[in-house]
Amino acid sequence: SLLQLRKMIKKMTNKEPILSYSKYGCNCGMAGRGKPVDATDXCCXXHDCCYGKVTSCSTKADSYSYSWEE
């Protein structure tokens, strides 16, 4: 879900995602497009691509089980 994504970004970067990344690079925020300018921008492009492939699902509202290692 978008809420889970926000929490993950906040935990890993200690930044508020909406304020820090809504207009970052070419792909972060609404209507992203173009060649990513760096690794963070590439992550936004990959995120948008994944959402684009599952448009028939409630991907933005559904909760998902996930984990990561620091």
UniProtKB/Swiss-Prot annotation:
Domain of life: Eukaryota
GO MF: calcium ion binding; calcium-dependent phospholipase A2 activity; phospholipid binding; toxin activity
EC number(s) stated in the UniProt entry for this protein: 3.1.1.4
One Pfam family named in its UniProt record: Phospholip_A2_1
GO biological process, one term: lipid catabolic process
Catalytic activity: a 1,2-diacyl-sn-glycero-3-phosphocholine + H2O = a 1-acyl-sn-glycero-3-phosphocholine + a fatty acid + H(+)
Active-site residue list: 47
Note describing how the cofactor binds: Binds 1 Ca(2+) ion.
InterPro entries: PLipase_A2, PLipase_A2_dom, PLipase_A2_dom_sf, PLipase_A2_His_AS
GO cellular component: extracellular region
Keywords on record: Calcium, Disulfide bond, Hydrolase, Lipid degradation, Lipid metabolism, Metal-binding, Myotoxin, Secreted, Toxin
Enzyme class: hydrolase
Tissue specificity of this protein: Expressed by the venom gland.
Residues where Ca(2+) binds: 48
Family membership noted in the UniProt record: Belongs to the phospholipase A2 family. Group II subfamily. D49 sub-subfamily.
Note: Hemolytic and neurotoxic activities are not detected.
Protein name: Basic phospholipase A2 2
Phylogenetic classification of the source organism: Eukaryota, Metazoa, Chordata, Craniata, Vertebrata
